[in-house]
Swiss-Prot record:
Belongs to the thymidine kinase family. Homotetramer. The lineage of its organism: Bacteria, Pseudomonadati, Pseudomonadota, Gammaproteobacteria, Enterobacterales. Its EC number is 2.7.1.21. Keywords: ATP-binding, Cytoplasm, DNA synthesis, Kinase, Metal-binding, Nucleotide-binding, Transferase, Zinc. GO terms for biological process: DNA biosynthetic process; thymidine metabolic process. GO terms for molecular function: ATP binding; thymidine kinase activity; zinc ion binding. The active site is at E89 (proton acceptor). It catalyses: thymidine + ATP = dTMP + ADP + H(+). It is found in: Cytoplasm. This is Thymidine kinase. PANTHER family: THYMIDINE KINASE, THYMIDINE KINASE, CYTOSOLIC. NCBIfam families: PRK04296.1-5 (NF003300). It comes from Blochmanniella floridana.
Length: 192
């Protein structure tokens, strides 16, 4: 029986690497995978692939707020059987797209593995994360560590001087050095 999985963490936990490894495992067994990533991530570099920090890459389809994932996946699956759907940057999904993914699991019987952030730099849930936390069959937290050695489960946004940014757009792209994964204790110490 297929399930909807949500793999979440703070930044720099290896979510994309884990996604690409999962896809490879399916492909190694002769199974087809279909990968998606968020258009907002691709707009900066006009890319249509998923790339991990350690250099692994794979081509991917792009989703934006208007993408009907159930319809797209149904068409591709009808042409040739898909064995697994993998979504990178799933925190950018909207409510209807998470519903689409539940239909992929329940109607098409295809497992869906979603990888993304749980919260933003203000410790607020992203839309996709909110609905995946509500509707996923399995929730799996990927671990990374704070500079103190505790598990990091929050993200701070910092400026060029190393000062914490407390306000601004939820979505901002730039160097990964603008974000620091920290534990709850150090989030509150630095953020407040």
């Amino acid at each position: 029986m297929s399930k909807l999985y949500f793999y979440y963490s703070a930044m720099n936990a290896g979510k994309t690497t884990a996604l690409l490894q999962s896809s490879y495992n399916y492909q190694e067994r002769g199974m087809r995978t279909l990968l998606y990533t968020a258009a907002v991530v691709c707009q900066k570099n006009d890319i249509k692939y998923i790339r991990s920090r350690i250099g692994l890459t794979s081509s991917a389809r792009i989703f934006n707020g208007k993408t009907n994932l159930f319809k797209q996946i149904s068409i591709v699956n009808k042409e040739k059987k898909i064995h697994c759907i993998l979504i990178d940057e799933c925190h950018f999904l909207n409510r209807n797209q998470v519903i689409d993914l539940t239909k992929v699991v329940d109607i098409l019987n295809i497992p869906v593995l979603c990888y993304g952030l749980r919260t933003d730099f203000q410790s607020k849930l992203f839309s996709g994360s909110l609905w995946l936390l509500a509707w996923a069959d399995k929730l799996i937290e990927l671990k990374t560590i704070c500079y103190c050695g505790r598990q990091a489960n929050r993200v701070l946004r910092i400026d060029n001087n190393g000062c914490v940014i407390r306000a601004g757009s939820q979505i901002m792209f730039g160097d990964n050095n603008q974000y620091v994964s920290v534990c709850r204790k150090h989030f509150h110490k630095k953020y407040n």
